[in-house]
């Protein structure tokens, strides 16, 4: 198969003393996200999408939250590992589309920086990376500012042999 599509979804609750990292970018906010790793919910959803596209499970399988080795882990390292696995199967980035679902913080000022980080990690142009944000109009846990949800869809393309 020459193309593969993967979908990823992740949620993290606000809390703790860690800084808020989204898409590899530090976002000024009153709190971070509770997680076993650094809590970068954007990179977790993308990692799941990449793994799903090449039928390699999910990040919980590769980086279990019961393993102390991954406590506080840099999610960019985890993402790069997932992408390396896809490249080992002969795939490279076609395009990526990410939706950040959060009432707060406002994401618009940070979108371009996130796109640049992702383009760097996926060794591609920012034209292949889309990041957008939306709210739930104050409905649900994201609307109550209890956490952030992220959906990611990735298209991987088989490299020419």
Curated annotation (Swiss-Prot):
Residues the record lists as binding 4-CDP-2-C-methyl-D-erythritol 2-phosphate: 10-12, 36-37, 58-60, 63-67, 102-108, 134-137, 141, 144
GO biological process terms, semicolon-separated: isopentenyl diphosphate biosynthetic process, methylerythritol 4-phosphate pathway; terpenoid biosynthetic process
Site location (Transition state stabilizer): 36, 135
GO molecular function: 2-C-methyl-D-erythritol 2,4-cyclodiphosphate synthase activity; metal ion binding
Record's function text: Involved in the biosynthesis of isopentenyl diphosphate (IPP) and dimethylallyl diphosphate (DMAPP), two major building blocks of isoprenoid compounds. Catalyzes the conversion of 4-diphosphocytidyl-2-C-methyl-D-erythritol 2-phosphate (CDP-ME2P) to 2-C-methyl-D-erythritol 2,4-cyclodiphosphate (ME-CPP) with a corresponding release of cytidine 5-monophosphate (CMP).
Subunit structure: Homotrimer.
PANTHER family associated with the record: 2-C-METHYL-D-ERYTHRITOL 2,4-CYCLODIPHOSPHATE SYNTHASE, CHLOROPLASTIC
Family designation: Belongs to the IspF family.
UniProt-recorded name of the protein: 2-C-methyl-D-erythritol 2,4-cyclodiphosphate synthase
């Amino acid at each position: 198969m020459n193309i593969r599509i993967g979908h990823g979804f992740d949620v993290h609750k606000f809390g703790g003393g860690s800084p808020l990292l989204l898409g590899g970018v530090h976002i000024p906010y009153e709190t971070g996200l509770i997680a076993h790793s650094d809590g970068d919910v954007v990179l977790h959803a993308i990692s799941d999408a990449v793994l799903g596209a090449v039928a390699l499970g999910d990040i919980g399988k590769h980086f279990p939250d019961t393993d102390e080795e991954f406590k506080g882990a840099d999610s960019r390292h985890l993402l790069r590992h997932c992408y390396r696995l896809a490249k080992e199967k002969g795939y490279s980035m076609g395009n990526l589309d990410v939706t950040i679902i959060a009432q707060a913080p406002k994401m618009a000022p940070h979108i371009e920086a996130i796109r640049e980080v992702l383009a760097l990690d996926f060794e591609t142009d920012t034209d292949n990376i889309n990041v957008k944000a939306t709210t739930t109009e104050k409905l649900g846990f994201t609307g109550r500012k209890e956490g952030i949800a992220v959906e990611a869809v990735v298209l991987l393309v088989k490299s020419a042999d």
